[in-house]
Amino acid sequence: NIRYILGFMFSGILIYGIYEYVVSVDYTKDINKLKNQLEQNEKLVKDNKDNYMVKLKEEEDNWQKKLQTLEEDESKLDEIVTNLPVVGIGDSVLLGAVNNLYNRFPNGYFDGKVSRTAWGINDILLTLKNNNVLGNPIVFNLGTNGDCSLECKEEILRTCEDRDIFWINTVNLTDVNVRLNNLASSHSNLHIIDWYSISRGHNEYFTYDGIHLTNEGRKVYTDTIYNAIYNIYKEKYIEKK
């Protein structure tokens, strides 16, 4: 009997030890790696701001010529979309992908910041607009850290005027996504990028927290943004024809 009791106790201790190991997985290494990547990308954002202003002016000068070229050859659409003066503003999800975004949109400007919400974004837009460097289209990755009011979002859209806006929804706050869809239903220039559905079931896209992106996730995220912009511009091209 003592042997059975001791065996039972040993089994209990072993199971408890395994449980403790599973629930106390140390993510310190992953957290530090993500933190270092975001800090490096913040520097990249600052370094590219002045360069964007120069490129935007050059693109404005060449824009009409490019549109004429597109009328003659639809295959040029990829080149045109790639060279758009895209403005991307977002939180640490976008910040983590800025290298990929600059590679895909070399004439773009991307401003990502850790823990950013949509509150206060209008001031950033106004600064760009007042300096004549608010490009088109505009990409937002905002909502992961919480929503802002309807009036806050309406103010953002008013500042953007008739520019095409691509707002990426969240993977963690479905109520934010519902409100974004409702907002888009009354604004024809607001296009929702459904990152929630596209990324669902793809754990390989995410780091330990299920929100920030792995290398593979950043590639898919960037491709998703590009495809959304490309499809809208293609629709406009077809309508124009």
PLM features: residue spans?
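Alpha-helix C-terminal capping segments
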Residues: 100-108, 128-133, 155-163, 167, ...
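N-terminal secretory targeting modules
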Residues: 1-85, 99, 226, 230-241
